[in-house]
A protein has these predicted regions:
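Alpha-helical membrane segments and adjacent membrane-interface helices in multi-pass membrane proteins
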Residues: 62-121
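Hydrophobic transmembrane alpha-helices
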Residues: 2-4, 8-78
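Alpha-helical transmembrane segments of integral membrane proteins
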Residues: 21-33, 67, 71, 86-91, ...
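Membrane-embedded alpha-helical hairpins and interfacial helices in multi-pass inner-membrane proteins
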Residues: 51-55, 131-213
Length: 213
C-alpha cells in the first residue's frame, strides 16, 4: 500500500511575516505603483477628463462623479498587492503627489481627496484582516472610498451649490464608478499583474500560483 501526501496551498494569503512586517520590497513596489498611476492620472487629467467632464456636466452636473473611480485605483491596487496597513494610503498619496507636481486643476487638494479615498480601502482591508483579494472585497473598498470622498469632501468643497437630491445622485454615481473602475478594474489589474509573475513576492502572486495548482 502506498501512502501519498498532498500539500494544500492556502488560497488566501497574508503578507510575508504578517501584515505589519513591512519589507524594503513592499515600500519600493508601493512607491513604483504610485508613481506609475500618478503619471496615468496626469495623462487622464490632461487628455481625457476635460472632455468627459464637460459632457457629463452638460447632461447633468452630478453625473461628473462617474469619473471618481479612476482616482481610487492606486489605493485599491497598492493595498491589495502589498496587503499591509498603510499600503493603500502610501500608494494613493504618492500618486496624488505626482499628479499635483505634474500639474492639475485641483492643486494640492488632491492630497486630501487621496487620503479620504485611501482611508476607505484601508478600513475594508483591516476588516478582512489584510487577507484575500476577492472581487467582493475590492468592490466594498471602492464603495466605502466613494462614500468618504463625497460625504466628507466633495459635497462641501465642489458641490456646495447642489441640492440634497443632486448630492445623493452624485454619491450614487461615485459609488457606481468606484465599483466598476476601482473595484472591478483594480481587481482585474492586480490579477493581470500577478499572472505575469511580477507579484510572486506578494500575496496576490502566491494566490495566483495557488489557483494554478
Amino acid at each position: 500500500m502506498t501512502a501519498t501526501t498532498s500539500t494544500t496551498i492556502p488560497r488566501t494569503q497574508l503578507a510575508v511575516g504578517g501584515p505589519v512586517a513591512w519589507r524594503s520590497v513592499d515600500l519600493v513596489t508601493t512607491a513604483i505603483l504610485g508613481v506609475a498611476l500618478g503619471v496615468a492620472f496626469w495623462g487622464w487629467d490632461l487628455l481625457l477628463y476635460p472632455a468627459v467632464s464637460a459632457l457629463l456636466n452638460t447632461a447633468f452636473p452630478p453625473l461628473a462623479s462617474l469619473t471618481l473611480g479612476v482616482w481610487v485605483l492606486p489605493a485599491v491596487v497598492g493595498g491589495f498587492v502589498v496587503r499591509r496597513p498603510g499600503a493603500a494610503l502610501l500608494c494613493e498619496i504618492v500618486a496624488a503627489t505626482v499628479e499635483a507636481l505634474l500639474g492639475n486643476q485641483w492643486g494640492l487638494n488632491v492630497m486630501i481627496s487621496g487620503a479620504l479615498q485611501a482611508l476607505g480601502v484601508e478600513i475594508i482591508l483591516a476588516v478582512f484582516l489584510w487577507r484575500g483579494f476577492r472581487l467582493g472585497v475590492a468592490v466594498l473598498a471602492g464603495v466605502l472610498s466613494a462614500i468618504l470622498e463625497l460625504c466628507c469632501w466633495e459635497w462641501w468643497v465642489y458641490q456646495g451649490e447642489y441640492t440634497l437630491g443632486m448630492k445623493l445622485v452624485a454619491l450614487g454615481c461615485a459609488v457606481v464608478s468606484c465599483i466598476a473602475i476601482s473595484g472591478l478594474g483594480g481587481w482585474a489589474l492586480v490579477r493581470a499583474m500577478a499572472a505575469t509573475g511580477a507579484l510572486n513576492a506578494f500575496p496576490a502572486g502566491r494566490e495566483h500560483l495557488a489557483r494554478r495548482g
